[in-house]
């Protein structure tokens, strides 16, 4: 189990630059969270995860070149120590099931309050699961 004594190093992958910028802004205002890399597609996410070894990868589900589900499977096969938090607009049960079966540690809706997303990042970093309360 990891502790929160040092910054949580986050990779942020979403194909929408405006979404990445907004998430980056509130994550970096939070104590002990640092966005170390950003990707605008799934293949770039895999490359940057391998290169930077983040503590947590935040992935959108629908991205070009590889989906968040595909990237999650890749992480579990190649970078097991990286926590995966899927941050998406999809609240359908089949997506939630597919993401969790792929090995994600958390699933949070983009409509969640920034504090909830920050809490989910911290939960995933410390080895806990993080599920959006609106999905339950």
What positions do the PLM features span?
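Conserved sequence signature across two-component system core domains
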Residues: 13-14, 39, 57
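Active-site residues of response regulator receiver
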Residues: 14, 60, 88
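The feature encodes the CheY-like receiver
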Residues: 19, 64
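Short hydrophobic/Thr-rich beta-strand motif most characteristic of the beta2 strand and flanking loop
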Residues: 32-40, 48
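Acidic catalytic/metal-coordinating carboxylates
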Residues: 41-44, 65-70
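Short amphipathic alpha-helix used as the core "switch/output" element in two-component signaling
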Residues: 47, 69-81
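The short loop immediately C-terminal to the conserved phospho-acceptor aspartate in CheY-like receiver
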Residues: 55-57, 61-62
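Short, flexible helix-to-coil linker/hinge segments that flank and couple to helix-turn-helix
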Residues: 94-101, 105-136
């Amino acid at each position: 189990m990891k502790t929160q004594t040092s910054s949580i190093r986050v990779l942020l992958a979403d194909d929408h630059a405006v979404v990445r910028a907004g998430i980056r802004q509130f994550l970096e205002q939070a104590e002990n969270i640092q966005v170390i890399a950003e990707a605008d597609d799934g293949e770039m996410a895999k490359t940057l995860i391998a290169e930077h070894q983040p503590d947590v990868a935040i992935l959108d589900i629908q991205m070009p070149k590889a989906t968040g589900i595909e990237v999650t499977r890749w992480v579990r096969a190649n970078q097991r120590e990286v926590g995966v938090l899927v941050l998406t607009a999809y609240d359908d049960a089949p997506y939630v099931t597919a993401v969790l079966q792929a090995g994600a540690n958390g699933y949070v809706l983009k409509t969640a309050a920034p504090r909830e997303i920050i809490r989910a990042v911290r939960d995933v970093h410390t080895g806990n699961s993080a599920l959006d309360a609106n999905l339950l």
